From Swiss-Prot:
Protein name as annotated: Regulator of nonsense transcripts 3B
Protein family: Belongs to the RENT3 family.
Keywords of this entry: Cytoplasm, Methylation, Nonsense-mediated mRNA decay, Nucleus, RNA-binding
Pfam family name, one: Smg4_UPF3
Subcellular location(s) of the protein: Nucleus; Cytoplasm
A GO biological process held by the record: positive regulation of translation
Primary localization class, coarse: nucleus
A molecular-function term among this protein's GO annotations: mRNA binding
């Protein structure tokens, strides 16, 4: 469609001119025809100049108008230049279109830009106005007003005083005039604003100083309070040290009490009733601390006499008595604590002793069982040798018994602490075993249960030997 439009001849515009009845008689109406002669070349390279365009369009037909417009950066990415041409002869338009429509322009970077040639939407062309020279240009020296100005200017320079005092007076007068001038509302507003800003700054600075002063005051009070607390703590420590010294002196003065226990009592009774002992000890202590009747009477009589003697001394005596009472209570507590500690240590020793005995009993029982097994094996081997009359058969068990003895001795030598079985704290029926093992003498397993076990093991050994 675009090519058809370009190839077709442009339409001619018909303009009708209306004439009045009077003009009709004088001038007949004429139809004026306007032909389209102005074209536009679009999509030119953005770096192209007017001189380069004219150079590339040569040879150009007769033109009366050529205007070039460079690319507009605000229309990115559509950065193209364009040119407008107005031909004098309408026939040259078709030839120009055939030549440059689709013509590829190349810029300095080597990029290709195919151009488009079409009629300009606005066909009017700016008229060329002849610039007339101004008649008054270069005639200022002859102007009367300019001459008057020069005379006035040169006369002031001649009249200017050379005395510096007069100059200073004139300058001061001028400054006074300037200062006496009224200020404008805008200047007043600015001055007022500056004044308010300075006042706020001063207020802020004053507040900051006050805050710092209060902070320093609080720190000083805190330091004083801390110092006072330290002094009080040191005083309390000194008092406590003095009290502890008195306490130690009283402890040294008091005789040490040793508790004797009956060895006939069983260990089970001690473990089952540990709570009854402290009560009995407390009762014994109360009996010891309780004074006799004569002492009570003497104390009461003495107290009555002191009350009769004088009241001001009672306060000091009461304080001294309270202190003595506190010291005695502290001593009693310390004594109880030591006694409990001794009792705990004694219980631990008993428990360790019992465990050791239990372990020793188990070890003895195992040794006896092993010795019994060995004896039975020897007896069984002897019987076997008696039944079998062959010398070779009798030699083999002897060798096996010797080998087993060597292995046992080597195993005993190899047995170390880490290879021994772990000690069991509690085994049910271990006490009965120890009692039964203790009365048997050297043979150990004489009971029926031990004999059965020995028989079973002997049978197993026989089966192994047969295999």
């Amino acid at each position: 469609m675009k090519e058809d439009k370009e190839n077709t001849r442009p339409r001619e515009k018909k303009v009708e001119i209306k004439c009045d009845e009077n003009d009709k008689q004088e001038k007949p109406c004429k139809e004026k025809k306007e032909a389209m002669t102005k074209i536009v070349i679009r999509r030119l390279p953005p770096t192209l100049t007017k001189e380069d365009l004219e150079e590339q369009l040569q040879p150009l037909p007769e033109l009366d108008y050529l205007e070039f417009f460079s690319s507009d950066t605000s229309l990115f990415p559509h950065l193209f230049a364009r040119a407008y041409l107005n031909f004098k002869n309408q026939d040259d338009i078709v030839l120009f279109r055939d030549r440059f429509d689709g013509y590829v322009f190349i810029d300095n970077r080597g990029q290709e830009y195919p151009a488009i040639v079409e009629f300009a939407p606005f066909q009017k062309v700016a008229k060329k106005r002849s610039k007339k020279k101004d008649a008054k240009s270069g005639t200022i020296d002859d102007d009367a007003d300019y001459k008057k100005f020069l005379e006035f200017y040169n006369g002031d320079e001649e009249k200017s005083p050379s005395n510096p005092e007069i100059l200073l007076e004139e300058i001061e007068a001028k400054t006074k005039e300037l200062s006496s001038k009224k200020t404008t509302p805008l200047l007043d507003f600015l001055k007022n604003k500056q004044r308010i800003r300075e006042e706020k700054k001063e207020e802020r600075r004053r507040r900051e100083i006050e805050r710092k002063r209060l902070r320093e005051e609080e720190r000083r009070k805190w330091r004083e309070e801390d110092r006072r607390k330290r002094k009080e703590a040191e005083k309390l420590k000194k008092v406590e040290k003095a009290f502890e010294k008195d306490k130690d002196q009283h402890k040294d003065e008091q005789p040490k009490i040793k508790l004797l226990r009956k060895p006939e009592k069983a260990d089970d009774g001690e473990t089952e009733k540990p709570k009854d002992k402290p009560k009995k000890q407390d009762r014994e202590r109360q009996k010891e601390d309780r004074p006799s009747g004569g002492d009570l009477k003497k104390r009461q009589n003495g107290e009555h006499r002191e009350e009769k003697g004088g009241k001001p001394e009672d306060v000091g005596h009461k304080e001294y008595r309270d202190r003595d009472g506190e010291r005695e209570r502290d001593r009693d507590r310390e004594r109880e604590r030591r006694q409990k500690e001794k009792e705990r240590i004694r219980r631990q020793d008993e428990e360790r002793r019992r465990r050791r005995e239990h372990q020793d009993g188990e070890n003895n029982y195992r040794k006896r069982e092993e010795e019994g097994k060995k004896d039975k094996e020897r007896v069984w081997e002897k019987r076997k040798n008696e039944h079998t009359g062959e010398s070779s058969g009798s030699a083999r068990p002897e060798k096996s018994s010797r080998d087993s003895k060597k292995e046992e001795s080597a195993r005993k030598d190899r047995l170390r602490n880490k290879d021994r079985p772990a000690i069991q704290l509690y085994q049910p029926g271990s006490r009965n075993r120890t009692r039964g093992g203790g009365g048997g003498g050297g043979t150990g397993g004489d009971g029926p249960a031990a004999e059965k076990r020995a028989e079973r093991e002997a049978k197993k050994n026989q089966e192994k030997a047969a295999e």
